[in-house]
Amino acid sequence: MTHHTHKPLMAAWVAIALAVLAGILRTSQARINGAFAQEIHDAFLSGVISFGSGFLILLVIISFNKKGQQGWRQLMVAIRSGGITPWFTLAGTAGAAYVLSQTLVVGLTGVALYTVAFVAGLSMGGLFLDLWGVGPAGKKPLSFNRVGGAVLGIGAVALSLVGHSTAVSALLPLLLPLVCGVLVAWQDAANGRMTVIAGTPLTSTFLNFMVGTGVLLIATAFHSFSAGLPAALPTQPYFYLGGAIGVVFIGITAVVVREIGVLLMGLGSIAGQLLMAVILDFFFPSAQVTGVMILIGASLAFVAAAWAAWPKKKPHAHVAEPPADA
């Protein structure tokens, strides 16, 4: 697997700040899509409207953007020549699963508990993807900090469930954001690799939305055969912002992941996600109240990610004194 070397595009603190912003946007999208699904009582249709609107935005942009079109040609050449695995082009399926999980789960659990489960998966995914060198930043070996952080992230999910029903039917919805966290970590790594080849995040973002929209259209078509379609759609404009928000945060992560790696990018994203999740559930409570244990679990999830990303101290190498001149 070939890794491309590149000059840093930005300072590390700028990349981390952008990752935090991406996390804030992720949670905002989750809350909007979850509310949209509840409003129309159709998680599949709300998901395809969210993803499809993002695809239409990008289709217009790339139609007038020569760099994006050139990036598309470069990416196709790389796929045909074996310069990048074709599986990376399916990263949009992870995005589709993520959006669908928002519309299915957030209304049941609240955005804070959903986010704790999601970021636990994101941390574990980032850990192993960096170990395997899937992202553009190359391989990062296992360490005590990284393994401990991943285990602590799972503990954060368990802690957040204290006071909630432990029935299988109540816990099952949280498996979806947990798995989607792992998938999105892979999506971020794949997008980073494709962005390096294309020379612009526009190409990988467009491909994500094209593939994801296709997947959701097929799923929605099958679902509508049995459940039908809503009689009407809501008129509030904010329900339709999910796609535009997704365009922004996927573009950000495609750039940032090549600068600081999958796990560190995930750390910044997790900080933003947890912060926004608690704020949204506090000021705009949903079906589930954000209790003390969820707040503690959210804090623990952030500590877990920080621990996993904390750099390992390198032992000081002993430098022998040169022999004195005779």
Regions flagged by a language model, labelled:
Residues 1-20, 127-182, 295-326:
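Juxtamembrane helix-loop boundary signature in multi-pass membrane transporters
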Residues 61-78, 125-138, 186-197, 248-260, ...:
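C-terminal ends of transmembrane helices
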Residues 14-18, 43-65, 87, 151-152, ...:
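Hydrophobic alpha-helical transmembrane segments of multi-pass integral membrane proteins
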Residues 15-19, 70-97, 145, 172-178, ...:
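Loop-to-transmembrane-helix transition segments
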Residues 112-121, 202-211, 248-281:
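Helix-helix packing/entry segments at the starts of transmembrane helices
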Residues 28-41, 100-109, 134, 189-198, ...:
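Juxtamembrane C-cap of transmembrane helices in multi-pass membrane transport proteins
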Residues 19, 23, 47, 89-96, ...:
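Small-residue-rich segments of transmembrane alpha-helices in multi-pass membrane proteins
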Residues 30-41, 74-75, 104-105, 158-170, ...:
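Membrane-interface helix termini and inter-helical loops of multi-pass transporters
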